[in-house]
């Protein structure tokens, strides 16, 4: 459960990301593909090389979904219901991959906003991404 402080930290950090969300989303995906190469199996039709237009486009989708989630911290299940259905029923993404991408996103954010990536912000963003992952995998059961 996200506390009031967590919600404030998440909104503030996401505000610092600003117009770079799509870029950071793509960078996190690229990082995931390099560090966890088995994740590429979910993107057989993608060019997963550095700078790929397909990775950039999917990074924007990830960033847009997270921006939606940041705007609906009190109702993540409602805000992400369609995305949860998509990943559970059509894409059938292994739930562990959400954790891997979350980790890569945290590393990416720490790299780009180091002054604002305090231990408290790190903890809040980690809880947020874990909550998003839980919602996205909730319909697997």
UniProtKB/Swiss-Prot annotation:
Modified positions (Phosphotyrosine) in chain numbering: 24
GO cellular component, one term: haptoglobin-hemoglobin complex
Alphabetically ordered keywords of this record: Acetylation, Heme, Iron, Metal-binding, Oxygen transport, Phosphoprotein, Transport
Coiled-coil spans in chain: none
UniProt KW Lyase keyword: no
Keyword Metal-binding: yes
GO MF: haptoglobin binding; heme binding; iron ion binding; organic acid binding; oxygen binding; oxygen carrier activity; peroxidase activity
Modified residues (N6-acetyllysine): 16
PROSITE patterns assigned to the protein according to its UniProt record, in alphabetical order: GLOBIN (PS01033)
Assembly and interaction partners: Heterotetramer of two alpha chains and two beta chains.
Official protein name in the record: Hemoglobin subunit alpha
């Amino acid at each position: 459960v996200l506390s009031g402080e967590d919600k404030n930290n998440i909104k503030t950090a996401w505000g610092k990301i600003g117009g770079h969300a799509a870029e950071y989303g793509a960078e996190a995906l690229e990082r995931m593909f390099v560090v966890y190469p088995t994740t590429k199996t979910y993107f057989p039709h993608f060019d997963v090389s550095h700078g790929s237009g397909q990775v950039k486009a999917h990074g924007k989708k990830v960033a847009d979904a997270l921006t939606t989630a940041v705007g609906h911290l009190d109702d993540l299940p409602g805000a992400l219901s369609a995305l949860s259905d998509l990943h559970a029923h059509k894409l059938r993404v292994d739930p562990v991959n959400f954790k891997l991408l979350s980790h890569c996103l945290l590393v990416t954010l720490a790299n780009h906003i180091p002054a604002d990536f305090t231990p408290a912000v790190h903890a809040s963003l980690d809880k947020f991404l874990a909550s998003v992952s839980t919602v996205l995998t909730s319909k697997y059961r």
